[in-house]
């Protein structure tokens, strides 16, 4: 990415976070960025211009939104939270309800565990947060999910942007059948970054952030599937954070790993919380106690209890919670 465009893009991203609902501010920003697009070097990649234009389009859509109350922008959204969920219900195949009246607030820069028996709705819930469930046919949901104060189902934030800012690491190891380098670079190019130097710098930083760089720096063109299980999972995390998300969703990220690899992933997760909010589905109560700050207990598609991990495991308020953590449920 050209230096000038990179600066414009960086500045716009920074300003985007501060955008309020006032019409005058939207119009002012639209004018500024239209001018910047007009002044870009003619050789600039069309994809890069499109990135800026898409942000302008978002602002223009906001002007058309007459109702800027809680249906779109939550006026009383607590800045300490990253998500606020109100009355969330979810169905598979139109009539099989798996989530019931979920009301939650998830704090920023904390590691929050979702615990509960298999089939209780944890994985379905976590996929609601970046609308991955919406990629499936025959699903529906209602209620409101506010991400940094914005209703994710109102059109104020498009799905691709949401999934970039709310990254996902899955239970199964999912490296692409590419080289180690291309596993990260591919996503960067897909998001309009084409400058080779910039890509190399981002790849290196992502691998360093996941403590993988020193292990693979001399073999970046090796196929990612030849890595060990722990290395593959760290690569998947590096791939997710290369796009600088606000949130990392993790669905049982260590369930397929041995104890040594699990320890390295847990250490990495604790380090990453300084920059990212992490929401993790886990069946390991020992892991929950070791690495998480907050815990949410699900049962039969409902939230039974939410609190600090220490409180949940030492002073649970609900009998059902106590039965579960003591192994009697």
From Swiss-Prot:
Entry EC no(s): 7.3.2.1
CDD domains associated with the record: ABC_PstB_phosphate_transporter
Boundaries of every ABC transporter domain copy: 83-325
Residue runs in coiled coils: none
GO biological process, one term: phosphate ion transmembrane transport
Record membrane topology: Peripheral membrane protein
PANTHER family reported for this sequence: ABC TRANSPORTER I FAMILY MEMBER 17
Keyword tags: ATP-binding, Cell membrane, Membrane, Nucleotide-binding, Phosphate transport, Translocase, Transport
Gene3D superfamilies, A to Z: P-loop containing nucleotide triphosphate hydrolases
Subcellular location: Cell membrane
One GO cellular component, as annotated: plasma membrane
GO molecular function, a single term: ATP binding
Family statement: Belongs to the ABC transporter superfamily. Phosphate importer (TC 3.A.1.7) family.
Protein name: Phosphate import ATP-binding protein PstB
Function text: Part of the ABC transporter complex PstSACB involved in phosphate import. Responsible for energy coupling to the transport system.
Binding-site residues for ATP, renumbered to this chain: 116-123
